[in-house]
């Protein structure tokens, strides 16, 4: 069953003209992570590189392509967690960084802290030799259009949010049985300056534990934080539920308790995986035993050989 990597490209409503690109993006990310695992790379390597690839893809709400805050600026959050040691690293409200997930990994590996935020994260990035990029390089025309649309007096905030909840994430188990997760996001459209969501919060925006499994979620950050969604999924798995059952229970609780929609990708320590969501759509892909699994709508489960490129 090992190794395995599962990725998501965000939950919500994906406009028709972007569905194919979103699916291609998650498939490529899963292939990238799986290739690392096949070469004997670690689960941490796999999830970080899979997520970094999606951060560079302007079709996702992470890195380049991130949504804009109320001032029209990009502020990003990211998390990495190593299930072997329970070490984690995160950055929040970080600016002008092309790959926040890689900076989060540096926080995990080079500091005694779990999370650095805003200017402190920027100073740390500079000390690590991580280059700053011009903010304009992270802003797409699509993000600008959504920002302007949401500023209009008659804007439907629910419609605008559901159209771009595209947090990206990955979970993996490597050949040694070690588990990891990574999540990255630009956050909510037109959020207040300095708003931080679930993504960089351990137990909310991700969790990994070799004894149980790993989760990376997507959806409405405030709802995910209220129910500590990632740890809730793993709690159900500790009680003997499968990854799929645990995901469905946790997502149903979030909907019932705080009216929150979202999705998760999950693995357990045996390599059993799930990609489940309560939102309209979630682009996801998984690679295991030479097969690439992927989908977008409820009920989707397509497969093709991992090495087959579209």
From Swiss-Prot:
Keyword Amino-acid biosynthesis assigned: no
Protease found in the keyword field: yes
GO CC field: cytoplasm; photoreceptor inner segment
Catalytic activity: L-asparagine + H2O = L-aspartate + NH4(+); Cleavage of a beta-linked Asp residue from the N-terminus of a polypeptide
GO molecular function annotation: asparaginase activity; beta-aspartyl-peptidase activity
EC number: 3.4.19.5, 3.5.1.1
Membrane spanning stretches: none
InterPro entries: ASRGL1_meta (IPR033844), Ntn_hydrolases_N (IPR029055), Peptidase_T2 (IPR000246)
Gene Ontology process terms (BP): asparagine catabolic process via L-aspartate; proteolysis
Keyword vocabulary terms for this entry: Autocatalytic cleavage, Cytoplasm, Hydrolase, Protease
Subcellular location field: Cytoplasm
Active-site residues annotated for this sequence: 167 (nucleophile)
Residues engaged in binding substrate: 195-198, 218-221
PTM comment text: Cleaved into an alpha and beta chain by autocatalysis; this activates the enzyme. The N-terminal residue of the beta subunit is responsible for the nucleophile hydrolase activity.
Effect of loss of the gene: Abnormal and deformed fish at 6 dpf.
Top-tier EC class: hydrolase
Family as reported in the entry's similarity comment: Belongs to the Ntn-hydrolase family.
Quaternary structure annotation from Swiss-Prot or TrEMBL: Heterodimer of an alpha and beta chain produced by autocleavage.
Function description: Has both L-asparaginase and beta-aspartyl peptidase activity. Does not have aspartylglucosaminidase activity and is inactive toward GlcNAc-L-Asn. Likewise, has no activity toward glutamine.
PANTHER family, sorted: ISOASPARTYL PEPTIDASE_L-ASPARAGINASE, L-ASPARAGINASE
Full protein name: Isoaspartyl peptidase/L-asparaginase
Gene symbol of the encoding locus: asrgl1
């Amino acid at each position: 069953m090992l190794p395995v990597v599962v990725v998501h490209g965000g939950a919500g409503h994906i406009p028709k003209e972007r569905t194919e690109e979103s699916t291609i993006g998650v498939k490529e990310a899963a292939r990238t992570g799986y290739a690392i695992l096949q070469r004997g790379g670690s689960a941490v390597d796999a999830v970080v590189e899979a997520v970094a690839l999606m951060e560079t893809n302007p079709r996702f709400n992470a890195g380049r392509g991130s949504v804009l805050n109320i001032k029209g600026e990009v502020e990003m959050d990211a998390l990495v967690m190593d299930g072997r040691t329970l070490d984690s690293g995160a950055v929040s409200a970080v600016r002008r960084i092309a790959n926040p997930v890689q900076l989060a990994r540096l926080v995990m590996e080079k500091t005694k802290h779990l999370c650095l935020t805003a200017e402190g994260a920027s100073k740390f990035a500079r000390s690590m030799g991580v280059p700053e990029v011009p903010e304009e390089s992270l802003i797409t025309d699509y993000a600008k259009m959504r920002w302007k649309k949401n500023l209009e007096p008659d804007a439907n905030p629910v419609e605008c949010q559901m159209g771009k909840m595209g947090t990206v994430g990955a979970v993996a188990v490597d050949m040694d049985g070690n588990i990891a997760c990574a999540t990255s996001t630009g956050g909510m459209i037109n959020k207040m300056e300095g708003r931080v969501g679930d993504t960089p919060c351990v137990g909310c925006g991700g969790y990994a534990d070799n004894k149980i499994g790993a989760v990376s979620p997507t959806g409405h950050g405030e709802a995910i934080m209220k129910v500590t969604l990632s740890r809730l999924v793993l709690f159900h798995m500790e009680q003997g539920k499968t990854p799929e059952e645990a995901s469905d229970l946790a997502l149903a609780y979030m909907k019932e308790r705080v009216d929150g929609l979202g999705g998760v990708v999950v693995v357990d320590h045996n390599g059993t995986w799930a990609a489940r969501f309560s939102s309209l759509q979630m682009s996801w892909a998984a690679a295991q035993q030479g097969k690439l699994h992927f989908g977008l709508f409820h009920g989707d489960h397509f497969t093709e050989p991992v090495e087959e490129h579209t």
